[in-house]
């Protein structure tokens, strides 16, 4: 039976926390700006780590520039994190842009827009929404 948390998963979680702190506090590169570390996948032999990051930018060129800046500083970031973690081998860092947060926000906005459009159409045609029907029933019970 496998352990609930494998060693690589524990290391990935600690690496994610340390990377987030280093990127927020120690990185002074203005090209990077505010970055969020969403996830870290560490290879089984601990030689590589894929670091999934998100920026508050939607422009693809800016995102590519920020990822390139992180990749260029990967050695420096790796050395800062290595000083904080007790590992014999510090994984080589590869930064990857994670668009899931931006896509999730986009989908949420689309759903909200569709709901508000439906409610507006229902009001135009005189159809009560579920919330309005509940209010009418409550008033009739009194």
Swiss-Prot record:
> Membrane-spanning residues where?
none
* Protein species of origin: Shewanella halifaxensis (strain HAW-EB4)
Stretches for region Disordered: 119-142
GO BP, sorted A to Z: maturation of SSU-rRNA
**MF terms in GO:** ribosomal small subunit binding
Its localization reads: Cytoplasm
Gene3D superfamilies for the chain: 3.30.300.20
The entry's protein name is: Ribosome-binding factor A
Lineage from the top down?
Bacteria, Pseudomonadati, Pseudomonadota, Gammaproteobacteria, Alteromonadales
Described by its record, this protein's role is as follows: One of several proteins that assist in the late maturation steps of the functional core of the 30S ribosomal subunit. Associates with free 30S ribosomal subunits (but not with 30S subunits that are part of 70S ribosomes or polysomes). Required for efficient processing of 16S rRNA. May interact with the 5'-terminal helix region of 16S rRNA.
Q: What Gene Ontology cellular component terms go with this record?
A: cytosol
